[in-house]
Structures are given as structure tokens and as C-alpha cells.
Curated annotation (Swiss-Prot):
Ca(2+) binds at residues 253, 255, 257, 259, 264. Residues 592-617, 1159-1175 have a biased composition (Polar residues). One of its GO terms (cellular component) is cytoplasm. It comes from the Eukaryota. This is Ninein-like protein. Keywords: Calcium, Coiled coil, Cytoplasm, Cytoskeleton, Metal-binding, Microtubule, Phosphoprotein, Repeat. SMART domains: EFh. Disruption phenotype: Morpholino knockdown of the protein results in severe morphological defects including ventrally curved body axis, ventriculomegaly, pronephric cysts, expanded melanophores, small eyes and circling swimming behavior. In addition, morphans display shorter retinal photoreceptor outer segments (OS). In ninl morphants, in the inner segment (IS) malformations are also found including swollen Golgi complexes with enlarged and distended cisternae, accumulation of vesicle-like structures throughout the IS, large vacuoles and dispersed mitochondria. The gene is Ninl. Residues 464-590, 660-791, 821-876, 919-1146, 1202-1278 form a coiled coil. It comes from Danio rerio. Its main location: cytoplasm. Required for the intracellular transport of organelles and vesicles, and is essential for the photoreceptor's outer segments formation, maintenance and function.
């Protein structure tokens, strides 16, 4: 290790020392030293280090140099005692033990002379024990000579550098694997990984890019999640779960952009970490690098006791791979090997005198090795070539075996260290996770308890408040129902009185109808009498006339037939009237029966009305709406109510207080809704019954009107009869007058043929006129009759259609109500099912929560057990590692003993005769040693199997821990999902409540609409009744209505004019407001432009100010440069002065020397010196002049620059003052503009308010206009109806008048 690396390591140690120096004095006390040792993982050597540094003085303090010396001393001592022989086992070659041959024949020796080489399994088993050192020392104190480590800090740190240089031989892929595993298992930085040295090989960008290009990922310079999984699989992080991969991706993605860049990947996976070394050893337990073959050969040459080339290079024999286990091989194999390597006379070589090996017997490899060794030492012929080829082959083979053994040993060490790190890290992670889970669960439980308490208090307060509100509402409703009951009773009494009056009126009307019938029969009999009289009179009058009289008689017969037909029609109409009267009586009897039933059922109806909670004002104001419902409806409602309440009461017992309160609320709400539905159904049934009663009443009224019209028709017919009688009387008088005239004319004899013709003409004209009038009467009566019948049919059809339509509406509404009730019942059932499901879910959630608690407790216990097992396993691993280290040390001692025995065996070979007995003893000792070694190997193998089984159990425990952790995570996810389900259920209940509220609102809206429609129908019926009752009065009020219509038209015209005026004024106001706003907008735009210009000016001024400040800064920089130049000039002047003084001193010194020389020198030398002195004086003078001129120039330049700088500063100050004044002015102007804008905004707000007021007034006027238009439309409709009624009355009058005229 060079000096730079040593200084760097000392600096690192100094940084750690300073980090523990809390006082900052450079000294550490006992507590700070313990903290530093804990950081350096020297807890095992802490007492020795404290005793070395502090001694008996516990309150002493130590500086860094003292700590460094004590640290090196303690570390070297620990290296002497605790470093096991595994270092020498891989630093030194394993020399095979030589055994005494079993049979000796002359110069030839047969049998094994060395131990069989260990198999690969044994090599790996030996390597497993290498990382664990032992502190035990052999009791006899016999220790083999080994390479000791240096006790200095340089040697300790050089070990790290050697290891690092050895690790550089690994490939990039293996480096990736190691780094990835280290990153995976040491994410918290507390594993057992050693501190990375500074010269560790870092992964470059090129290597990472090469891996990415090999996999075909990271084309855009970043990785997504799938590409990261591919890279992790490639570099050795295989079998990662999805959660671990997500955690690694989130950790690498530092900027949270969803991708991992190259820098993030390299810094996240391959950055160096400082980790504490394991507690079992004080030296870094890193995998030992492979030594080079040259170094191993050198050490073997150094350590070998045999002077031969064979023992120095490859051991005591060659061609080991041809050995079949007995130390011998067939000569054919050796010859085949030599012939393969190019030696063709292998048979001759084996049969030479020097080697003298038989081709029929088996060839001993040890003897061949010794023979070849001797030949190499003696001669240099072809035998040497065979020996060299054999050496080369053996060396290559041994190199391969050594490399494999070292690799397997390093791999086993790394696996053991990694398993220890994983165990410790898993224990820590499990502890941390359990602690975090416990804290999270406790915090969640506390939060849930607090939430439940808050909700419980809120629900209690809400329930108390709602109960108080309900009590108040019940009291108010009770008072209101009492008032309604009193009203109903009073209305019942008034209705009974009205019924009595209507019954009396009906009787009176029946009596009048019977009287009118009698009068009608009398009139008919009088008409028949008058008709007979008229027939007789006409027959008597016109008997004496000529044959033309027969035509008159025929016409009279026709007239009589027509009258008979009319009489028949009158009888039919009378029959029709009788039928209508009978139907009217039936309807009256049905109405009286209904009233008696209603009066009987008034008591239970009143009881039922006491339970009504929510009724509309229209129902309470209308007395007909207070009647009770039918018993069937009541029974159905009671049955559904009982079923629903029973279903609600039969629910499962409450699970928690919150669910109980929610269930009570839902139950109360449901009862209230059912009660509302019952009340609504009652009101609708009452309304429809009342509407049926009103229809019946209307029918009675219409029938009364019809009877009245018939009475009027009868009176009109009576008038017609009277008129006919008067006309008959007039005709009788005219006939009598005519007869008298005829008699007078006939008696006077003055009548001639002309008078008879004139009489005949007059008679013919009279007959024609009479016939024409009769035909006109007949036609008019038939038309009026047809019209009356058609009107009656139309009216009856309309009434029947109306009744049917109303019945259809009632039935459809009843069906709709039934469907609605069924839908509501289904909704109630669905709500009950939802409540049951929610309750079941809540129970399941609570069961799952309890189960989770139990699982958590069980997992805690299992984790504690696993933790204890892991600790036991780690302790067992440490114990077994120490035992393995002890066994390895014993093996090393045995190998050293074997080495000594081989040395002694070589001496015995030189002294054959004297060493026979000693060779036998050595053979026995070797056999014992072999047996002991075999026993040790067997014991070590068993312990290794035990360790492997324990490792397997530890792995299974770790797998179980991972399964437990996954179960915990799944359980937490289940808890989260259950909480989400709970929240979703609560949301669903809230949504269901909102849906119920919406349904209730829709029901209320529909009820209000139905009530409005019913009110409209009632008003229409009332209006119809009023119009029917006031039909007679409307004829008189027609003129008034026309006047009113004219007034309304005038008023409408005035309103239209006012509307036009208002619209005109509104338009004018809008136009003025728009013009004002446009002007303001224009002014604001102009002001905005001005402000923009000013802002641009300000920006330009700011730019100019920035430029000036920049110039000022440049001037200041120039001034600073000038000052530095001035200082430099002054320094130069000072230097010049100093040089001048030095030159003068030197000059004086030279003059003194010259004077001294002149005293002893010659004249020539003096003259020469004088010339030199003159030249020197001239040079000094020139130099002084030059310095003076430079100083003057510098002073002049400095003055000029100072003057320029002062001028620039003055001009800059002036410009700054001007800019500040301009800025002040602009600020004042901007403030004024801001104030103006504020005033303008206030004006705009006022104008907006005025506009809103105008819009409001306009809307009000529009509403008033709409109301007036509606009133006008309704008045026009009423006037149109009145006109129609007047026209109908006029038609009736026209029909009735001709009949009276004909009569």
C-alpha cells in the first residue's frame, strides 16, 4: 500500500473520530470512545481498547494520535490471536501428506505415499469454516510457522486493497448480482456488509448502458416498471415479488415522474454504503481473493524443505489425474499421455536403465516422480522433456483445482455472510413492521373509538332534538285536529239542515209538477173542445158554399191531423218528463241513503282523522275532505301497516349503537311515510267520493234545470194555447161579421157577380194565407222539436261522457295509487333487505375485525417465536462456526505434523537401514493420524449436515415469515376493503334516504298537482253551477257584461298603451344606459391605452435604469481594477525601491571589496574595477530614472482615472435623481388613475344596480301584463260563454214565440 492510500484511510478514521467528538476539543472520554467503537464495530474489543487507552483512569481523555496507536496495537493483537489458520490455508499450498510405502523392492517402492486429494465437496466444506475465526490457542503451544500479518495500520488497510484488487477480477455480471443482492438485503444500511473501500470498482455508465442495450430496454434514457423487472432479473435480483418490485421502483424514481433514469438507477442500486462489520471478528470478513500461481509457486518454493524441483513445484508426485486411488497407474496411460504431448519414445524412456520401470506391472507415480526428479537434476536429455511435459500437465490441473476450490470457498463464505445478514435484517424488519403495525392499529382503534363516541353523542343530541320537535308537532297537530273535529261537527249539522231544506224543496217541486200536470190535462181538454167547436162552426159556415168548400174541409182535416200529431208529441214529451222525474227521485233517494251511511260512519272517521299527521291546507279547509274512508281501504291499510311494522320489528338484534339509532330513525321515518300514505289515500278517496256527490248534485241541478225548462215550455205552450183561443175567438168574430155582411148583402140584393167573385178571391187568399201560416208553423215546430231533441241528446251524451271520463279518471287514479302503494311496499321491502344486508355486512366486518385482531395476536406470538428461533439459529451458527474454525485449526496442525513427518521420511529414505523401525513407527503414527483426520472429517461432515439442516429450517422459517407478512398485508387490505365497503354502505344508505326524500317530494308534488287539478275541477263545477243557476239572470246582465267587456277592452287598450309606453321608456333607458356604458368603455379603453403607454415608458425607463446601474457597476469594476493597478504599481515601486536599496547595498559592498582588492591588487585591476563601477552607477541611474518616470505616469493615469470616475459618478447620480423624480411622478399619476378607475367602478356598480332594478321593474310589469292578458282572456271566454248562452236563450225564445203566435 502506498502512502496516499494510507493517508486516506487515516483521514477516514479521523473523520469518524471527529464525528464522536461532541465537545469539539479533539479529545474523547470513555463514553465517546464507546460510541466510536460501536460505530467501528469493535464491541468485542471494547474492554481491551479502553484498558489500553485509558488504563485505570476512567475519567481520562484521549486524542487522535493516542487512539490510532492503541487501535493499531489492539487490532494487531487480535490478528495474532483471533485470526484462524484459514488465511494461511489459502495463502499457503496444501502439501499432500506422504505415507511410507507398503512394499519396497530394491530401489522400487510400492503402495501409497500420499493422501488422496479431497473431493470438491470436501473442499467446499473446508471453505465453509474459513470466515469464522477462533480465539482458542492450542494447549501444547505447538503452532506451525505461518505468514504473520503486519501489526501496523498500513497492513490492515492493505488487506482491504488486496481484497479489492482481487474482486476486480469478477465480471460485470457478477458485480451486478452482488451489488443487487447487497442492495436488496441491506436497504436500511444496518446489515453485516463491510465498509466499501474507496478504490472499489464502481459501475460505470457504459456498463449500465451495455446491459440495457443487451436487453433492448431504456431506448429513451429511462426505464418503466416492466423494463426494470427485466434488468433486475438480468443482474441477479430474481424472484422478486410484485410488492418488492414496486417498492424498488418507487425508491429509484426520486423525481416521481413514473420512470427511472440512468442516474437514478446507478445512484439507487450501485452507490456505496457504509455498513458495520459483524461482531464475531475484528477484521473485515471479506471474501479472500485468489492468489496468482506465481506467488503460490514462490511461497511453495520458500516453504518446501525438499531441494528438488518436483517438491518445490507440484509436490511429491506427478500425473495425479491418472491415479486410480492407490497411488499407482498403468504404464499404458502414462505412455499415451506422453505420446499425446509429442514424446514418441515413451516406451524406451520407461525401460531405460535410469528409470527401469516394468511395462507389465503397475507404475507407482511417486517412484516415477522421484526418478524424473533425479533425471532432471542429473542430465538434460529427452527424459527431461517428458518430465517437463508431465510437470506442465500437473501444474495446469492443480491450478484448475485450486481455482475451483477457492471459488467454492469464497462462494460458501459469501453465502454464509449473506444468510447471516438476511437473518438479522429480517429480524429487524419483522420487529419494525410489528412495531409500526401495532402503533398503526392502536392509533386506528383510538380514532375509531373517538369517531364512534362523537357520532354517538351527535346522534343522541339529534334524537333528543327530534323527539322534542316531534312532541311539539304532535301537540300542535292534536290541537289542530280538535279544531277540525269541531268544524266537521258544525259542518255536519249545517249539511243536515241543508238536506232537510232540499227535501222540503223537492216535495214542493213535486207538488208543483203534479199541479202543472193537472193544468196541462185541463188545457188539453179545453183545446180539444175548442177544436171541436171550431170544426162544427166551420162546417156550419161553409155548408152552403160551392164545391170548393170541400178543399177547405180537406185542409181543415189536414190541420186537425197536424194538431193531433203535435198533441202526440206533447204526450211523448210529457212521458219523457215523467221518466226524468222518476230518475230524479231515484237519485235523490240514493243521495239520502249515502248521507245516512256517511252520518253513521262519521264516528270512526273522526277517530281515524285524529291520527292524521300531515294534511294539506286545502284538505283542512274543505269540509268534504274531512270525511272518513271506506272500511275496505282502512282494513287494507291496517294490514299493510301491521305487516311492515312486523317486518321491521322482526329484524335481527342490534349490532352496535350506531346501527340501532340508524334503524330507529329508519323505522320512524318509514312509519311516518306509511302514515302519510294512509292519509293521502284517505284524502284521495274522500275527494273522489265528494266529487261523485258533487257530480250527483250537479246532475240533480241539471235535471232541475231541465224540469224548469220543461215547465217553461209548458207555460209557453199554455200561452200559445191562450193565444190560439184568442185567435179562434177573433176568427169566430170575423166569421160572424162576415156572415152578417153576407146576410146584409144578400138581403140588400145589391150583390152581384163581381162581389161574389171578390168574396171568393178574398176567401181563397185567406185560405192560402192560413194554409201558408199553418205550414210555416208546422215546419217551425218540427225544426224546434228536432233541435230540442238533439240538444237534449247532446247534453245527456256529454253528461254521460263526463261521468264516464270522471269514473275512468277515478279508477285510473285508484289503480295508480295502488301501483304506487305496491311500489312503495316493494321499496320498503328492498330497504328492509338493504338494512338486513348492511347489518349482516356490519356483523361480518366486526367478525373480520375480531378475526384480524386474533390473527394479529397470533402473528405477534409467531413473530416472537420466529425471532427467538432466528436468534437461536444465529447463536448456533456462531457456535458451529467457532467449532469449524477449531476443527480447521486442528486439521492445519495435523497437516503440519504430516509435513514434518514427510520431512523425516525423506531423511529416512536416505538412511534406509537405520530408518526401517522408525519408518514403521511413522507409518503407524500416520495411520493413526489418518484415522483421526477421517474421524474429524466425519464429525465435520455431520456438523456440516446439521448446519445445512438448520439453515434449511431457518429458510423455511423465513418463508413462513414472508407468508405471514403477506397474510398480514392481505389482512390489512381486507380491512381497508371492509372499511371501504362500510363507507360505501353508508353512502348507499344516504343515497337511499335522498331517494326516499325525492320520492316523498315527488309524491307531495303530485299530490299538490292533483289537489290543484281537483280544485280547478271544483271551481269549474262551481262555475258551471253558477252559470246554470244564473242563466236566467244573464239575459238581464247581458248589457252589463257587454258594458263591462267594453270597459275591459278600454282598460286593455290602456294597459297596452301603458305597456308600449313602459317598453318605450325601457328601451330608451336601455339605449341611454348602453350609450353611457359604451362611452365609459371607450373612455376606459382610452385610459387603458394611456396607461399602457405610460407602462411602456416606465418599462423603457426601467431598462434605462438597469442600463445605468450596469454602467455604474462596470465603472465600479473599472475603479476596482484601477485601484488594484494602483496597488500593483505601488507594489512595483516598493519592489523597485527595495531592489534599488539592495543594488546600492551591493554596490557599496562591491566598492568595499574593490577597495580591499585595490589595496592588494594592481593598477590595471583597479582601473578595470573603476570602469565596472562607472557602468554600474550608470545602470543604477538609468534604473532610477525609469522608476521615476513609471511612477509619474502611474500617478498621472490614476489622477485622470479618478477624475473620470468622479465625473461618471456625478452624471450617474444626476441621472438617478432624474429617474427617481420621474418614477415619483409616474407613481402619482398611476395613483390618480387608480382612484379614477375606482370611482368609475363605483359608478359602474351603481349603473349595474340601476339596470338590475330596471330589469326587475320590467319583469314585474311583464308579469302584470301577463296577468291582465290572462284576465282579459278569461273575461273574453266568459263573455263568449255568455254570448253562447244568450244565443241559446234567444233560440229557445224563437222556438217558443212562433208556437204562441200559432196558438
Amino acid at each position: 500500500m502506498d502512502e496516499d492510500e494510507q493517508n486516506r484511510y487515516v483521514a477516514q478514521l479521523k473523520d469518524e473520530f471527529d464525528s464522536c467528538d461532541t465537545t469539539g476539543t479533539g479529545y474523547l472520554d470513555k463514553e465517546e470512545l464507546t460510541a466510536l467503537c460501536h460505530k467501528l464495530s469493535l464491541d468485542a474489543h471494547l474492554p481491551l481498547l479502553l484498558d489500553t487507552l485509558l488504563g485505570p483512569q476512567h475519567y481520562a481523555r484521549v486524542n487522535f494520535e493516542e487512539f490510532k496507536e492503541g487501535f493499531v496495537a489492539v487490532l494487531s493483537r487480535s490478528l495474532d490471536f483471533s485470526t484462524s489458520e484459514e488465511e494461511s490455508s489459502y495463502l499457503e499450498p496444501a502439501v499432500p501428506e506422504e505415507v511410507k510405502p507398503k512394499y519396497v523392492k530394491g530401489t522400487k517402492r510400492y503402495g501409497r505415499r500420499s493422501r488422496p486429494d479431497k473431493t470438491d465437496l470436501e473442499l467446499t466444506a473446508d471453505s465453509d469454516s474459513l470466515p469464522f475465526g477462533t480465539d482458542k490457542v492450542e494447549a501444547n503451544g505447538v503452532r506451525r510457522a505461518k505468514l504473520r500479518r503486519s501489526t501496523s495500520l498500513e497492513s490492515v488497510e492493505s488487506l482491504k486493497s488486496d481484497e479489492d484488487t482481487g474482486s476486480n477480477k469478477e465480471s460485470t455480471h457478477h458485480y451486478f448480482v452482488a451489488q443487487g443482492q447487497l442492495k436488496l438485503w441491506n436497504q436500511d444500511g444496518t446489515g453485516n456488509c463491510q465498509r466499501s473501500s474507496d478504490n472499489q470498482q464502481e459501475v460505470t455508465d457504459g456498463q449500465v448502458r451495455a446491459v440495457w442495450e443487451e436487453l433492448g430496454v431504456g431506448a429513451a434514457g429511462s426505464l418503466n416498471r416492466e423494463e426494470l423487472s427485466l434488468v433486475c432479473d438480468h443482474i441477479g435480483l430474481k424472484h422478486l415479488e410484485a410488492e418488492e418490485l414496486d417498492a424498488l421502483f418507487r425508491k429509484l424514481d426520486k423525481d416521481q415522474d413514473g420512470k427511472v433514469s440512468l442516474i437514478e438507477f446507478q445512484s439507487g442500486l450501485f452507490k456505496p454504503h457504509d455498513h458495520a462489520s459483524p461482531l464475531s471478528t475484528s477484521t473485515p470478513a471479506r471474501p479472500k481473493p485468489l492468489r496468482t500461481i506465481s506467488k503460490a509457486l514462490e511461497e511453495r518454493v520458500v516453504r518446501s524443505t525438499s531441494p528438488s524441483l518436483l517438491s518445490a513445484t507440484v509436490g511429491q508426485r506427478l500425473l495425479t489425474r491418472l491415479d486410480d486411488g492407490s497411488g499407482c497407474t498403468s504404464p499404458e496411460k502414462v505412455m499415451a499421455l506422453w505420446t499425446e504431448e509429442g514424446i514418441h519414445n515413451s516406451r524406451d524412456i520407461l525401460q531405460t536403465q535410469t528409470l527401469d520401470f516394468s511395462l507389465e506391472e503397475r507404475l507407482c507415480l511417486a517412484e516415477l516422480t522421484l526418478a524424473l526428479d533425479n533425471e532432471l537434476l542429473v542430465s538434460g536429455n529427452g527424459i527431461h522433456q517428458a518430465a517437463l511435459v508431465s510437470y506442465k500437465n500437473e501444474i495446469n490441473y492443480l491450478q484448475v483445482l485450486a481455482d475451483q476450490a477457492c471459488q467454492e470457498r469464497d462462494k460458501a463464505k459469501a453465502d454464509l455472510e449473506q444468510a447471516d445478514r438476511r437473518n438479522l435484517q429480517l429480524v429487524r424488519e419483522v420487529d419494525d413492521r410489528h412495531a409500526t403495525m401495532e402503533s398503526l392499529n392502536e392509533s386506528k382503534i383510538k380514532d375509531l373509538e373517538q369517531e364512534f363516541r362523537d357520532k354517538l353523542t351527535a346522534l343522541r343530541s339529534e334524537s333528543e332534538y327530534e323527539s322534542e320537535v316531534l312532541l311539539e308537532q304532535v301537540e300542535k297537530e292534536r290541537e289542530r285536529l280538535r279544531d277540525e273535529l269541531q268544524l266537521l261537527r258544525s259542518q255536519d249539522i249545517s249539511l243536515q239542515e241543508d238536506m232537510c231544506t232540499t227535501v222540503n224543496e223537492n216535495r214542493r217541486l213535486e207538488e208543483e209538477v203534479s199541479a202543472l200536470k193537472e193544468k196541462l190535462t185541463e188545457a188539453e181538454s179545453a183545446i180539444s173542445k175548442l177544436q171541436n167547436d171550431l170544426d162544427r162552426l166551420l162546417q156550419d159556415k161553409y155548408d152552403g158554399l160551392d164545391a170548393n168548400g170541400t178543399g177547405l174541409l180537406n185542409q181543415e182535416e189536414q190541420f186537425t191531423e197536424i194538431f193531433k200529431e203535435y198533441e202526440q208529441q206533447c204526450r211523448e214529451l210529457q212521458d219523457r218528463n215523467d221518466e226524468l222525474c222518476s230518475e230524479l227521485e231515484l237519485l235523490k233517494s240514493q243521495g239520502s241513503g249515502k248521507r245516512t251511511r256517511l252520518s253513521r260512519s262519521s264516528l270512526p272517521a273522526n277517530d281515524w282523522s285524529n291520527r292524521r299527521a300531515l294534511t294539506t291546507e286545502s284538505d283542512s279547509d274543505d269540509p268534504e275532505m274531512k270525511k272518513g274512508t271506506s272500511p275496505q281501504v282502512r282494513k287494507k291499510l291496517q294490514v299493510t301497516d301491521k305487516n311492515v311494522l312486523g317486518s321491521l320489528e322482526s329484524l335481527a338484534p342490534p349490532v352496535s349503537i350506531e346501527t340501532e339509532l340508524a334503524m330507529e330513525k329508519m323505522k320512524e321515518r318509514y312509519e311516518q311515510e306509511v302514515q302519510d300514505l294512509k292519509i293521502q289515500l284517505e284524502t284521495k278517496v274522500n275527494f273522489y267520493e265528494r266529487s261523485m256527490d258533487l257530480m250527483r248534485q250537479n246532475m240533480e241541478v241539471e235535471r232541475k234545470d231541465i224540469s224548469q225548462s220543461f215547465k217553461m215550455e209548458i207555460s209557453e205552450l199554455e200561452d200559445l194555447k191562450a193565444r190560439a183561443e184568442e185567435r179562434a175567438e177573433q176568427m169566430r168574430q170575423t166569421t160572424e161579421r162576415l156572415e152578417a155582411e153576407l146576410r146584409g148583402k144578400t138581403s140588400g140584393g145589391a150583390w152581384g157577380q163581381e162581389q161574389e167573385r171578390r168574396i171568393q178571391r178574398e176567401r181563397a187568399e185567406l185560405e192560402q194565407n192560413y194554409a201558408r201560416e199553418i205550414s210555416n208553423l208546422v215546419l217551425r215546430l218540427t225544426s224546434e222539436k228536432d233541435q230540442l231533441e238533439a240538444e237534449l241528446k247532446l247534453r245527456m251524451d256529454r253528461e254521460v261522457l263526463l261521468v264516464r271520463a270522471q269514473l275512468d279518471e277515478v279508477t285510473s287514479e285508484n289503480c295508480a295509487l295502488k301501483d304506487r302503494l305496491a311500489v312503495l311496499q316493494q321499496d320498503v321491502k328492498s330497504l328492509e333487505e338493504d338494512v338486513n344486508n348492511k347489518r349482516k355486512k356490519l356483523e361480518e366486518m366486526e367478525k373480520g375485525y375480531m378475526k384480524n385482531r386474533e390473527d394479529e395476536e397470533r402473528l405477534r406470538k409467531e413473530n416472537s417465536k420466529c425471532r427467538e428461533e432466528v436468534l437461536d439459529l444465529s447463536a448456533r451458527n456462531l457456535q458451529l462456526s467457532s467449532e469449524n474454525a477449531e476443527l480447521s485449526s486442528r486439521l492445519c496442525t495435523d497437516q503440519r505434523a504430516v509435513q514434518t513427518l514427510t520431512d523425516r521420511l525423506a531423511q529416512v529414505c536416505q538412511e534406509r537401514d537405520a530408518a526401517a523401525v522408525s519408518s514403521k513407527q511413522l507409518q503407524e503414527n500416520l495411520q493413526q493420524q489418518e484415522n483421526h483426520g477421517l474421524r474429524l472429517q466425519e464429525q465435520w461432515r455431520k456438523e456440516k449436515e446439521l448446519l445445512e439442516r438448520e439453515l434449511q429450517t431457518a429458510k423455511e422459517a423465513l418463508q413462513h415469515l414472508t407468508v405471514v407478512e403477506s397474510a398480514l398485508t392481505s389482512q390489512t387490505l381486507k380491512n381497508k376493503s371492509l372499511e371501504q365497503d362500510k363507507e360505501s354502505l353508508l353512502k348507499e344508505t344516504a343515497e337511499n334516504d335522498q331517494k326516499l326524500k325525492k320520492l316523498q317530494e315527488a309524491l307531495r308534488n303530485s299530490e299538490t298537482q292533483i289537489e290543484q287539478l281537483n280544485a280547478q275541477i271544483l271551481t269549474m263545477w262551481q262555475e258551471k253551477d253558477v252559470h246554470v243557476q244564473e242563466a236566467a239572470a244573464h239575459i238581464k246582465m247581458l248589457q252589463q257584461s257587454q258594458d263591462k267587456v267594453q270597459e275591459l277592452e278600454e282598460r286593455i287598450s290602456q294597459l297596452r298603451k301603458e305597456k308600449e309606453q313602459v317598453q318605450h321608456t325601457h328601451r330608451l333607458q336601455e339605449e341611454t344606459a348602453v350609450s353611457v356604458l359604451q362611452n365609459e368603455c371607450k373612455s376606459l379603453r382610452v385610459q387603458n391605452k394611456e396607461l399602457q403607454n405610460k407602462v411602456a415608458q416606465l418599462q423603457s425607463r426601467e431598462l434605462e435604469l438597469q442600463r445605468l446601474t450596469h454602467e455604474c457597476l462596470t465603472l465600479r469594476n473599472k475603479q476596482a481594477e484601477l485601484e488594484t493597478a494602483k496597488q500593483e504599481a505601488n507594489q512595483q515601486a516598493m519592489r523597485a525601491e527595495s531592489t534599488r536599496s539592495m543594488v546600492q547595498a551591493q554596490h557599496t559592498r562591491e566598492i568595499q571589496e574593490l577597495k580591499e582588492q585595490m589595496g592588494s591588487g594592481t593598477q590595471e585591476h583597479a582601473s578595470h574595477l573603476q570602469t565596472q563601477l562607472a557602468e554600474q552607477q550608470r545602470r543604477t541611474q538609468d534604473f532610477e530614472d525609469l522608476l521615476r518616470s513609471q511612477a509619474k505616469q502611474a500617478s498621472v493615469q490614476m489622477g485622470l482615472q479618478q477624475e473620470q470616475y468622479e465625473k461618471l459618478m456625478a452624471s450617474m447620480q444626476e441621472r438617478m435623481d432624474e429617474v427617481e423624480a420621474k418614477l415619483k411622478n409616474t407613481r402619482v399619476m398611476l395613483q390618480e388613475k387608480v382612484n379614477q378607475l375606482k370611482e368609475q367602478l363605483a359608478k359602474n356598480s351603481k349603473s349595474d344596480v340601476l339596470l338590475k332594478d330596471l330589469y326587475v321593474e320590467n319583469s314585474q310589469l311583464m308579469k302584470a301584463l301577463q296577468v291582465t292578458e290572462q284576465r282579459q282572456k278569461s273575461a273574453e271566454k266568459k263573455s263568449f260563454l255568455l254570448e253562447e248562452k244568450v244565443i241559446a236563450l234567444n233560440k229557445l225564445l224563437r222556438k217558443i214565440a212562433p208556437a204562441s203566435l200559432t196558438a
